[in-house]
Amino acid sequence: MDPPGYLLFLLLLPVAASQTSAGSCSGCGTLSLPLLAGLVAADAVMSLLIVGVVFVCMRPHGRPAQEDGRVYINMPGRG
């Protein structure tokens, strides 16, 4: 039985990570503390905005469903 592709990828990931040197990032600068705090705050605000939009979109709209007069024997609490 052949292992799935992602399993092979996960097994080879440490090998690929060990091949890269620590200073291989050319042109990368350090992040200042205010910039890092701003990025974290912006991420938190965007996450809350996404959660709010999903909450508003998933709310039931309009009037509630009307109860019908049917008797459901196998459903407790109905009829």
Swiss-Prot record:
Localisation? Membrane
Transmembrane ranges, per UniProt, are 36-56
Name of the protein in its database record = Hematopoietic cell signal transducer
Report the function annotation for this chain. Answer: Transmembrane adapter protein which associates with KLRK1 to form an activation receptor KLRK1-HCST in lymphoid and myeloid cells; this receptor plays a major role in triggering cytotoxicity against target cells expressing cell surface ligands such as MHC class I chain-related MICA and MICB, and UL16-binding proteins (ULBPs); these ligands are up-regulated by stress conditions and pathological state such as viral infection and tumor transformation. Functions as a docking site for PI3-kinase PIK3R1 and GRB2.
Q: What else is known?
A: Immune reactivity to healthy cells that express KLRK1 ligands can happen under physiological conditions; NK cells are able to reject syngeneic bone marrow grafts when the bone marrow cells expressed sufficient KLRK1 ligand.
Entry's family note: Belongs to the DAP10 family.
Q: Which domain of life is it from?
A: Eukaryota
Q: Which InterPro entries match?
A: HCST
Recite the UniProt keywords alphabetically.
Disulfide bond, Glycoprotein, Membrane, Phosphoprotein, Signal, Transmembrane, Transmembrane helix
The encoding gene is Hcst
Q: Where is this region: GRB2 binding site?
A: 72-74
Using the UniProt record, give the first listed, main subcellular location. membrane
Q: Which organism is it from?
A: Mus musculus (Mouse)
Q: Describe the inactivation phenotype.
A: Mice exhibit low expression of KLRK1 in NK cells, but no expression in resting T-cells. KLRK1 expression is not induced upon T-cell activation, while it is up-regulated in activated NK cells; NK cells promote KLRK1-mediated tumor rejection due to substitution of HCST by DAP12/TYROBP. Mice lacking HCST exhibit antitumor phenotype; they show enhanced immunity against melanoma malignancies due to hyperactive functioning of a group of T-cells that share properties of both T-cells and NK cells (NKT cells).
UniProt GO molecular function:
phosphatidylinositol 3-kinase binding; protein-macromolecule adaptor activity; signaling receptor binding
Which residue stretches belong to region PIK3R1 binding site? 72-75
Record-linked PANTHER family: HEMATOPOIETIC CELL SIGNAL TRANSDUCER
Q: Name one GO cellular component term.
A: cell surface
For this protein, what post-translational modification is recorded in UniProt? Phosphorylated; PIK3R1 and GRB2 associate specifically with tyrosine-phosphorylated HCST. O-glycosylated.
List residues, modification Phosphotyrosine: 72
* Cytoplasmic side stretches: 57-79
Q: Has the keyword Iron-sulfur been applied to this entry?
A: no
